[in-house]
Amino acid sequence: MSCGIANAIRWDVSLLIHRSMSSSMSSVQPTSPVSDSPSLGEMHASVAVSRRGHWGFRLLAFLGPGYMVSVGYMDPGNWATGLAGGSRFGYMLLSVILLSNVMAIVLQALAARLGIASDMDLAQACRARYSRGTTLALWVVCELAIIACDLAEVIGTAIALNLLLGVPIIWGVVITAVDVVLVLLLMHRGFRALEAFVIALLLVIFGCFVVQIVLAAPPLQEVLGGFVPRWQVVADPQALYLAIGIVGATVMPHNLYLHSSIVQTRAYPRTPVGRRSALRWAVADSTLALMLALFINASILILAAAVFHAQHHFDVEEIEQAYQLLAPVLGVGVAATLFATALLASGINSTVTATLAGQIVMEGFLRLRLRPWLRRVLTRGLAIVPVIVVVALYGEQGTGRLLLLSQVILSMQLPFAVIPLLRCVADRKVMGALVAPRWLMVVAWLIAGVIVVLNVKLLGDYAVHLMVGVSD
């Protein structure tokens, strides 16, 4: 980013907070119609893109949005489902992680296509396409997904602080409320600073898991066999529950809104040729980033299978339990510390992207702009309350089940983001020359069908479970 562009988009954080707090009513600012305002207006087209030179430099200019999106694919919610799946079923659910990642690559590519082709994010496109009632319903569902995601971040960060520093869970939850300062400072530095911060923490997570996998030394043949799909995943209700949780933890609803917006931060030529070139680079960016997410998610499950399942610890659902077992089983104390460090980095990273997603969703659906600090406080406040209630009623051991439940909730909300996305990218009036080809739409609708069928199956199992419970 050139110095002129960077200076043009910098925020005065102190002035922002002063103006926002001067009047609670003035914090809510109606904007001009969304169709007239670019998504994330202050960061729109703020990152310079070289139009010439070596392809590597052009790729570097586009690298970033995909890695910010990938954060949602390796947040603390993935840890809970991966640990539970690996400890209970060994390597069997690796096939679900692989399938989920392929689904994510396709859906994120479509989200990037929508943003680049239409100059709208998914929330803006939904608002332009649907009635007011439908738009409001989609907004509510998306906000619930963001809160469920934030719930996982709160729990994960609080647990990491407890494991590393001995901070009680309930105080760790309270500490997470002040992360708004971090978000504001990063936004003040510009979009490239946000991306650099996120990528740095991703590298920390990656490094931690490389060391842990080397220490665990899982059998390669069994690991590779786990990537082959098995019918037992669908036939076993417990395996299906965890599989749906993995899908929910991997393919995040709000990531589709986020990606369709932040790809527009690049200052590519808004011409047919410029858009097509930008789409190629954006898809390369997101695919590379999601392959990193695949490695990390698979590593969590492989670690659980190699360390816990192999030692007959079949019910490791709590992250704290995994931390306590890692050092004795592996015989290396640093493994547990690396595990907790990666968890903390994951929770902090997710904070940044969840804040951006919340801002995009509210502005796109409602034409309503909140100050970033207020938006963050509202979302985090709604996520903190259920965690505090669960800790107060059931103790710290209840957070693990709450974490798993949050991922299943996310999966249940996926159709409400995926189906509008598919309808938009198939509309030539919206997409122009970049309308999604028929073969891609067939693949995308198959993915949507899998998501819907899995959720219907889960609801059916829940209904049967409830009826059996009542009859008993």
UniProtKB/Swiss-Prot annotation:
Classification of source organism: Bacteria, Pseudomonadati, Pseudomonadota, Gammaproteobacteria, Lysobacterales
Gene: mntH
Gene Ontology MF, one: manganese ion transmembrane transporter activity
An annotated GO BP: iron ion transmembrane transport
Native source organism of the sequence: Xylella fastidiosa (strain 9a5c)
Subcellular location: Cell inner membrane
Top-level division of the source organism's lineage: Bacteria
Its membrane topology: Multi-pass membrane protein
Protein name per the record: Divalent metal cation transporter MntH
Keyword Zinc: no
Keywords associated with the record: Cell inner membrane, Cell membrane, Ion transport, Membrane, Symport, Transmembrane, Transmembrane helix, Transport
